[in-house]
């Protein structure tokens, strides 16, 4: 059987960019572990703020962090109190000067990470995995997606044998590199164990297609 490559990693350098932007020689491993700690800390602290992704840039002894969220008000807090507390916590965590930017996600239903997290939260609240997937697919298609596929794996409905069930609508061209496909995973902790959630969202083509010139000067 053929295995599916991560659609985001496959498109880096074509239509996607890196989420960590820095150069390191012998400090590479330290920077990588620090990035993982920063992302884990932010995702835990802002678990209710619908955080999609965290971009990290480095310059000398300074770390620039960009948080993509659907609820910027929760991240900033009253008068900027929350984001200032977060900055101080990250300062002590990294030992470097941290600058935080916040970008709002206008359409949360077109963001694969937020969609996957939403399905996972519904599964934790004992909503049927079929209903959770079908409702989310309808919302995403209404938001303007050209295609979506969702998959939930694990002990579905408390079954003894784990299995996977997926639903899709529209088209999701995984082989087309110019196709803007957002992919994300999430986990749901249920009484029967963990359920894995995967989401692919096709948002249209990014690069313009070249017009074919007719031969013979016609």
From Swiss-Prot:
Listed name of the protein: Small ribosomal subunit protein uS3
Record function comment: Binds the lower part of the 30S subunit head. Binds mRNA in the 70S ribosome, positioning it for translation.
Organism of origin: Bacillus licheniformis (strain ATCC 14580 / DSM 13 / JCM 2505 / CCUG 7422 / NBRC 12200 / NCIMB 9375 / NCTC 10341 / NRRL NRS-1264 / Gibson 46)
GO biological process: translation
UniProt entry keywords in alphabetical sequence: Ribonucleoprotein, Ribosomal protein, RNA-binding, rRNA-binding
Family classification: Belongs to the universal ribosomal protein uS3 family.
Record's subunit section: Part of the 30S ribosomal subunit. Forms a tight complex with proteins S10 and S14.
Pfam family for this entry, one: KH_2
GO cellular component term, pick one: cytosolic small ribosomal subunit
GO MF, any single term: rRNA binding
Residues of the KH type-2 domain: 38-106
